Amino acid sequence: MSPPSDDAGPGPPRTLSLAARLSFAVGHFLNDLCAGMWFTYLLLFLHSVRGYSSRGAGLLLLLGQVADGLCTPLVGYEADRASCVRCGPRKAWHLAGTVCVLLSFPFIFSPCLGCGEATPEWAALLYYGPFIVVFQFGWAATQIAHLSLIPELVTSDHEKVELTALRYAFTVVANITVYGAAWLLLHLQGSAHGEQDISVGDQLGVQDVPVFRNLALLVVGVGAIFSLLFHLGTKEGHRSQHWGNEPNEHTPLVAPAAQPLLLWKHWLREPAFYQVGMLYMTTRLIVNLSQTYIAMYLTYSLSLPKKFIATIPLVMYLSGFFSSFLMKPVNRRIGRNMTYFTGLLVILAFAAWVALADNLGVAVYGAAVLLGAGCATILVTSLAMTADLIGPHTHSGAFVYGAMSFSDKVANGLAVMAVQSLHPCPSELCCGACISFYHWVMTAVTGGVGVAAALALCSLLIWPIRIRNRDPRDRP
């Protein structure tokens, strides 16, 4: 495969072989494995297993999200400016981020080294802080480098959707791996101790520390293998330092007017940048907050057995996995906006179901299918819309993805901290009031944020995505 050119200007369309598409799609697998644990199990591990306060657990998650949010636009800006002779700037940042994730993530889900029963909570939380910051820097570097490769590798809108859908399909596979491994480790733990099937609230405790530690080690081991496959199979083109490319048989006889570079400061003047940013942020809030609180909802509101913190998220992501394969034909038939709206309707149906049913029982599996399919649909479509926004301006694409992710990470962290601060049982793991608390949290993070996402979508229906023409002389 020849290296892709830098822009989507005149010339042959850039396409990828199946092997190249698959090798690209697995480049975010380590991040997805870690994110599955981070969002689904971090609060549960810190609050229910380690016994830290709900506010302390929320503070650590907020620290991670803010660190990620601050690093993301900086990495995006540097990735647009950087150069690397051997592998290209995006892959160089991807490699640096991967190393940071591998070295830091296992410590987050392990006991505090040197801490004892007399260690104050603030000291233990302080211990986890540096590992979380390093992990989030690495996660941000890997995410932005990987996302910003999409508009550089292919030019066709449908191929961008296909790459994004393949990427999300492996995101689902990663989460299936995490939840399947979690179920297996919990099952093996129960078999080893000959425990009876009792309520999850009674089972989760300090005895589960080895389960989460082993799960984290498994995550980084498997993720490292897939990161290696990405670097071996994905070729990033080296950027030319000159305007334009050498003429070939696809070059028009009369050259079009030169299109000025769209720099990071120019994006800040584009209304479409804020419209897509709001849609992306609300989409990520729905996906991440529902993933963060589903385990708490199952544990404390529905009082389901321990295995459900693995099986229900597994059902969600299996549903999302199968839905991701419908993205390309559905987008082609009804367009981006209607595809997103369809996914949003499914999520609102889930929110209504949760709000109206005090005890779902076996129906929780059906609700999980709805949530998984809806989240997959809106996430893939919002990423495709972001690629549409960037269009041929791939030289500043990493900044766009960085800015989008900054808003989503900080918003997620603040939302989690707000929820944790409102927790009605500050002095114990769960009192009677927290049963309804997590019930309404799940309703709000899907239905309430879903309404905000619908408003953002309406703005794109009224004012479609477009970049205003600028004077070519308007350069720094």
Curated annotation (Swiss-Prot):
Subcellular location: Melanosome membrane; Lysosome membrane
Lineage: Eukaryota, Metazoa, Chordata, Craniata, Vertebrata
Primary gene name: Mfsd12
Bilayer topology term: Multi-pass membrane protein
Record topological domains on the Cytoplasmic side: 1-25, 77-94, 143-167, 235-284, 328-343, 386-398, 466-476
SUPFAM superfamilies: MFS general substrate transporter
Sites bearing N-acetylmethionine, chain numbering: M1
Modification Phosphothreonine, positions: T251
Pfam families: MFS_2 (PF13347)
Lumenal-facing ranges: 47-55, 116-121, 189-213, 306, 420-444
Keywords for the protein's UniProt record, in alphabetical order: Acetylation, Amino-acid transport, Lysosome, Melanin biosynthesis, Membrane, Phosphoprotein, Transmembrane, Transmembrane helix, Transport
Organism listed in the record: Mus musculus (Mouse)
Post-translational modification: Phosphorylation at Thr-251 by MTOR via mTORC1 pathway promotes cysteine transport in lysosomes, thereby regulating lysosomal cysteine and cystine storage and redox homeostasis.
GO cellular component term, pick one: late endosome
TM annotation in the entry: 26-46, 56-76, 95-115, 122-142, 168-188, 214-234, 285-305, 307-327, 344-364, 365-385, 399-419, 445-465
Presence of the UniProt keyword Mitochondrion in the record: no
Function: Transporter that mediates the import of cysteine into melanosomes, thereby regulating skin/hair pigmentation. In melanosomes, cysteine import is required both for normal levels of cystine, the oxidized dimer of cysteine, and provide cysteine for the production of the cysteinyldopas used in pheomelanin synthesis, thereby regulating skin/hair pigmentation. Also catalyzes import of cysteine into lysosomes in non-pigmented cells, regulating lysosomal cystine and cysteine storage, which is essnetial for redox homeostasis.
Description of the deletion phenotype: Mice are darker and display a uniformly gray coat color, rather than the expected agouti coat color. Coat color change is caused by a lack of pheomelanin, resulting in white, rather than yellow, banding of hairs.
Protein name, as recorded: Major facilitator superfamily domain-containing protein 12
Family statement drawn from the similarity comment of this UniProt entry: Belongs to the major facilitator superfamily.
GO biological process, one term: cysteine transmembrane transport
Source taxon at top rank: Eukaryota
InterPro entries: MFS_2, MFS_trans_sf
Molecular-function GO term, any one: cysteine transmembrane transporter activity
Presence of keyword Acyltransferase: no
